[in-house]
UniProtKB/Swiss-Prot annotation:
It holds the Pfam family Monellin. The keyword Transferase does not apply. This is Monellin chain A. Taste-modifying protein; intensely sweet-tasting protein. Keywords: Taste-modifying protein. Heterodimer of an A chain and a B chain.
Length: 45
């Protein structure tokens, strides 16, 4: 997927044999991704 810094984009994470939608925000200051919220019972990374 394309990394868009400063913008929020949807990321589909495959976990527990099920597909959950997660909203991920790219933060270029910390050079990482900040998890906003998970739509589903997804265990923490």
């Amino acid at each position: 997927f394309r990394e868009i810094k400063g913008y929020e984009y949807q990321l589909y994470v495959y976990a527990s044999d099920k597909l959950f939608r997660a909203d991920i925000s790219e933060d270029y200051k910390t050079r990482g991704r900040k998890l906003l919220r998970f739509n589903g019972p997804v265990p923490p990374p």
